[in-house]
Regions:
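C-terminal reverse transcriptase regions that engage the nucleic-acid substrate
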Residues: 55-133, 269, 277-279
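Acidic carboxylate-rich catalytic motifs and surrounding loops in phosphoryl-/glycosyl-chemistry enzymes
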Residues: 104, 138-140, 179-182, 261-273
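RNase H-like nuclease fold core
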Residues: 89, 147-193
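RNase H-like nuclease module associated with reverse transcription
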Residues: 109, 145-147, 186-316
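Signature of WW domains and closely related Tyr/Trp-rich beta-sheet microdomains
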Residues: 1-56, 60-61
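Structured nucleic-acid-interacting core domains from mobile-element enzymes and related host factors
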Residues: 126-154, 218-219
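Short hydrophobic beta-strand that contains or immediately precedes a catalytic carboxylate
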Residues: 24, 149-152, 225
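Short coil/turn segments at secondary-structure boundaries
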Residues: 19-21, 28, 35-39, 44-45, ...
Length: 316
């Protein structure tokens, strides 16, 4: 499209960062994620001109600047630096559960990082500087654990460019978190139920792996998987495909596992699901609530047994 057709509105998306916080819809309700089209709408005359006047020149210039930066591909040296730091952030994300999703998103832009990618990297760095220490709490138990508990969640079509969904979750044993993950689904789900089913499949696979590891160590643990997706839980508990034949058969092995009693599926409220932090950007309140449910806490200072690799003690 070269010109704007119809009245244009500015809407606020749920979550996201600066340049992805806004999207445009025409009078027909069609969603347009293209920055080029959005700028065309702002610069055109006619119905969009009234919108531009109502929005204000300052806001328009701010949006134009953000849109330009989003398309500003980094130079070779800057791109190499971006990849190196993002790779270290991804390595750190294995321990820092609060940065798992952000690190994953940074690594997705390795092929062609732009100014927007760099801003997200800086934002993650500022967050780690403000919250340098995340402590895993392993409570003392008089009796050994009897169950592996998995929390999983999916953000349907969370990526505005590819429309792919993000699945994430955590594994708990004895009230302590032992594993977490956040990954983009390899295929584009046709519905939220299908995306959530794939997410439940990932959670079940992680739980079965931990259950098998415990069995090798002589612990016979039950497996309990929690999700806030009613439709996906219904599909996983039923027998056969019915009217959902378009789903991949590779995702329906969960039905057999449920029938055999190898695992149990439970419904959990979305507000109580700690896996929400692994599928999208969340605010501080949701993040801290999810971390507390996983027995993770922020602390000040530096751990006594932490290696002094940068000579910080000598500087003091």
């Amino acid at each position: 499209m070269d010109k704007c057709d119809g009245c244009v509105e500015l809407n606020k998306m749920h979550g996201g960062t600066k340049t992805s916080d806004y999207y445009y819809t025409t009078s027909l309700g069609a969603r347009l994620d293209s920055m080029d089209y959005a700028l065309c709408a702002l610069k055109s005359k006619g119905p969009a001109a009234k919108f531009k006047k109502r929005l204000g020149a300052k806001a328009v210039k701010s949006f134009e600047r953000e849109a330009f930066n989003a398309h500003g591909i980094l130079k070779s040296n800057d791109a190499t630096t971006y990849r190196a730091i993002s790779a270290r952030g991804n390595y750190l994300g294995q321990d820092r559960a609060d940065g798992s999703y952000s690190s994953k998103e940074l690594c997705r832009e390795f092929s062609a990082p732009n100014e927007h990618s760099l801003q997200k990297l800086k934002r993650l760095g500022r967050y780690y500087k403000g919250k340098p220490r995340l402590v895993y709490k392993y409570p003392f138990a008089k009796e050994p654990a009897t169950e592996v508990t998995v929390y999983c969640d999916t953000d349907f079509a969370g990526c505005s460019q590819t429309r792919r969904s993000t699945s994430g979750g955590c594994v708990m044993v004895g009230g302590a978190q032992v594993k977490h993950w956040s990954k983009t689904q390899s295929t584009i789900a046709l519905s939220s139920g299908e995306a959530e089913l794939v997410g439940i499949g990932s959670g079940c696979a992680q739980g079965l792996g931990m259950q098998s590891l415990a069995a090798d160590m002589g612990w016979q643990l039950k497996l309990s998987v929690h999700s806030d997706a009613t439709a996906a839980i219904g599909i996983a508990k039923r027998r056969g495909l019915g009217k959902i034949r378009h789903l991949h058969c590779t995702d329906l092995w969960i039905q057999e596992r449920v029938r055999n009693g190898d695992l149990q599926l439970h419904k959990i409220l979305g507000t109580d699901n700690p896996a929400d932090m692994y599928t999208k950007y969340v605010d501080a309140g949701i993040m801290e609530k999810a971390l507390r449910k996983q027995n993770l806490f922020f602390m000040e200072g530096r751990a006594k047994l932490a290696p002094d690799t940068m000579g910080l003690k000598e500087q003091k």
